[in-house]
Design a protein with these regions (language model features):
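Conserved catalytic/acceptor-binding region of the Class I
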Residues: 1-46
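Histidine (H) residue identity feature
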Residues: 6, 12, 43, 58, ...
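Short runs of predominantly hydrophobic/aromatic residues within well-ordered alpha helices
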Residues: 28, 62, 66, 107-108, ...
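C-terminal helical/coil "lid" or tail adjacent to the Rossmann-like core of SAM-dependent
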Residues: 43-99
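Short proline/glycine-enriched turn/loop segments at secondary-structure junctions
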Residues: 100-105
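Core SAM-dependent methyltransferase catalytic element
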Residues: 108-123
């Protein structure tokens, strides 16, 4: 059910937030392209967030992310609410030092973007 939740969450990210359809996971590459068109030098780098589920400092954020994914996926796919709730229960059970002996890792895809105005041509 990870794929169901991921697809529903990504679709939810792309919903209109009042300014037209949002870009969701495509936001960083789209911004990079527009910045390059406007004369910027752009660097993109993958920088996934890696949360250790057994780590007390990471577990609250992991739980909040999983809760948010559940909420967004359920809003996007109301007919799959029961399936998403079961997914949530399985995933949330792995968070915290008392529930994840030896740990596990939650990885959230993320992209950093750095842009600087390209130097003027000295031709």
């Amino acid at each position: 059910d990870d794929d169901l939740v991921r697809m529903a969450f990504n679709a939810h990210q792309r919903r209109d937030k009042g300014l037209g359809a949002a870009l969701g996971p495509e936001a960083a590459p789209a911004l990079a392209m527009r910045l390059v068109q406007r004369g910027f030098e752009v660097h993109l780098a993958r920088s996934p967030w890696r949360l250790k589920l057994a780590e007390p400092a990471h577990a609250p954020l992991a739980r909040a992310l999983i809760d948010g994914w559940r909420d967004a996926a359920s809003a996007q796919q109301p007919d799959a609410r029961a399936r998403i709730a079961a997914w949530h229960a399985r995933r949330i059970a792995g968070c915290g030092p008392d529930r994840a002996p030896g740990g596990g890792t939650l990885e959230v895809g993320h992209v950093d973007l750095f842009a600087v105005r390209a130097a003027a041509c000295a031709c």
